[in-house]
Amino acid sequence: MARNVLYPLYQLGGPQLRVFRTNFFIQLVRPGTAQPEDTVQFRIPMEMTRVDLRNYLEQIYNVPVAAVRTRVQHGSNRRRDHKNVRIKKPDYKVAYVQLAHGQTFTFPDLFPEKEPTSPDPLEEELPQQRQSSDPRCPGIPSWFGL
């Protein structure tokens, strides 16, 4: 499925100015349950078919695909508006793509765990400063703020 494209008029020795762009946007989704290493989960538009997804991945991204399975996920309708009317989220299609033999995919770890660093010396002095009295106002308790 492509946008309506207006092709330029023919020119002698005419260069190829046509660029194919799809109307589909697919999202790579981290699976909720454990999947085999050769299976990748996508969220795709309702209009997209298995054949469209296979061609999309093979032609644009050069990803070899063995099989494509799809299912329709119904949108939640638990939310209610100010008039107590249910608000339904739109349905979407989930595709499970099995990669060709020998291909594996592991979801990237975007936010790795950081190693605990040594505490900042200023953070260590802060509780001590709070406990000490203000030298500008001797004899006044610390709870009596300025």
From Swiss-Prot:
Top-level taxon of the source organism: Eukaryota
Keyword list, A-Z: Mitochondrion, Ribonucleoprotein, Ribosomal protein
Subcellular location: Mitochondrion
Region (Disordered): 108-146
Transmembrane segments: none
Main subcellular location of this protein, as a coarse class: mitochondrion
Keyword flag Acyltransferase: no
InterPro entries listed in its UniProt record: Nucleotide-bd_a/b_plait_sf (IPR012677), Ribosomal_uL23-like (IPR013025), Ribosomal_uL23/eL15/eS24_sf (IPR012678)
Annotated GO MF terms: structural constituent of ribosome
Signal peptide span: none
One GO cellular component term: cytosolic ribosome
One Gene Ontology term from the biological process aspect of the record: mitochondrial translation
Subunit structure as annotated in this protein's UniProt entry: Component of the mitochondrial ribosome large subunit (39S) which comprises a 16S rRNA and about 50 distinct proteins.
UniProt similarity note: Belongs to the universal ribosomal protein uL23 family.
Protein name listed in UniProt: Large ribosomal subunit protein uL23m
Lineage, broadest ranks: Eukaryota, Metazoa, Chordata, Craniata, Vertebrata
Gene: Mrpl23
